[in-house]
Amino acid sequence: MIQGTTSDAGKSTLVAGLCRLARRAGVRVAPFKPQNMALNSAVTIDGGEIGRAQALQAVAAGIDAHTDLNPVLLKPTSDRGAQVIIHGKARMNLDARAYHDYKPVAFEAVLASYARLKASYDTIFVEGAGSPAEINLRERDIANMGFAEAVDCPVVLVSDIDRGGVFAHLTGTLACLSDSEQARVRGFVINRFRGDVSLLQPGLDWLEAKTGKPVLGVVPYLHGLTLDAEDMLPRELRAAQASADALRVVVPALPHISNHTDFDALRAHPQVDFHYVRAGSAPPPADLIILPGSKNVQGDLAFLRAQGWDAVLQRHLRYGGRVIGICGGMQMLGREVADPYGVEGPPGTVEGLGWLDFSTTLTRDKTLKNVTGRLATDAGRIAGYEIHMGETQGPALDAPALLLADEMGGVRPDGARSADGQILATYVHGLFDTPAACASLLAWAGLKNADAIDYPALREASLERLADTLAVHLDLKRFWEAIG
């Protein structure tokens, strides 16, 4: 089990790399995360929903993503509550206290999934969540040491040296663990190191002498990896590699933004100057503004208005700019969004931005499906997925954005296009991941001679580079011996 001293220490990436190394060696390997809290998710082969990192790890392992890889997924709807997803299906919304009481039920789902994986695979790399040293979360823990103790799983602790304080993080985390939990930690991995590792050696010697546990590797900082992010927005809000005549793309960093992996292909595109715009920052000039998915559409609509984005969008459209709304962003572009059942917050109805003539009602049932099709205006093929709890109706849907294959072998429309051709809205995530669709959409937004980039191929190359790096910078013999 890979646990971290902090969030974003590198657990997800390390598990992905280890899965790829095991796959190369001919080992039947699977990733597993007992409990995940994330707004980036993926649709599985069995029609459920799991964290995006586990879907990436499944690619690394060479297996289909399915719900047993992440049996408990929490999707925050506010600072105090989250939608609880068990075995891929949304069960309920709970606040933090109520979920704490629900954990024994959730743990049963975790153990059931783990048992099925254990029966099917030779090796399972388990990813922890956050840090095991959160004293207030120790009772009924199902994500870190609570799980490791229950199934007798060895632990490797990873820490991010780029943030500073790595030795304090590692020794401090150990100090917060019980004796049995400390004994379960078999060694350390130091992640994101820059510089001459020989200068780090005195610290490594001290750490091993202090704890009696080996340092199993020092992994260098890998720039430019094209891998799906677990939850947080990328550290660099602007993609820096764009050409001088690049298309300017801007996305507001909504408080409840979901599936921002939709934009990874744009961030990697050499002809796109991509910006996330945080609260309080003035949006830069743009050719294309994209309203992203949201786990709280009403709250994020209020945020957009409070930040002046309604006026920004109005001015942008007046001068010929293009706008795309994806999932929750699509819903925001309509007349109104009704939440009669309190799916995302208090029941109620809010006025949308009003640029497309449709209205959305949030429902208790969630749509989860992988889709294929094409853009309605040209032959650009797409392959993506839907994750939403809304039903949208209105005249604007008569001019769809996409034409998708349905279950009967026919075609069904999705989304809407404005009459002037400046606005596209769709429920489909992963819109830019397919090379042909990405090139077509960038050309529609104003990019001359738009190139097609193969984002899945970039991701595959990054997984190979990651595995190559781990093969060099982890002491793999010592690693395998340490975890038994």
UniProtKB/Swiss-Prot annotation:
GO terms for biological process: cobalamin biosynthetic process. Residues 246-437 form the GATase cobBQ-type domain. Keywords: Cobalamin biosynthesis, Glutamine amidotransferase. The keyword Flavoprotein does not apply. The keyword Transport does not apply. The active site is at 327 (nucleophile), 429. Gene3D superfamilies: 3.40.50.880, P-loop containing nucleotide triphosphate hydrolases (3.40.50.300). Pathway: Cofactor biosynthesis; adenosylcobalamin biosynthesis. GO terms for molecular function: ABC-type vitamin B12 transporter activity; catalytic activity. InterPro entries: Class_I_gatase-like, CobQ/CobB/MinD/ParA_Nub-bd_dom, CobQ_GATase1, CobQ_N, CobQ_synth, GATase_3, P-loop_NTPase. Catalyzes amidations at positions B, D, E, and G on adenosylcobyrinic A,C-diamide. NH(2) groups are provided by glutamine, and one molecule of ATP is hydrogenolyzed for each amidation. Belongs to the CobB/CobQ family. CobQ subfamily. This is Cobyric acid synthase. It comes from Paraburkholderia phymatum (strain DSM 17167 / CIP 108236 / LMG 21445 / STM815). The lineage of its organism: Bacteria, Pseudomonadati, Pseudomonadota, Betaproteobacteria, Burkholderiales.
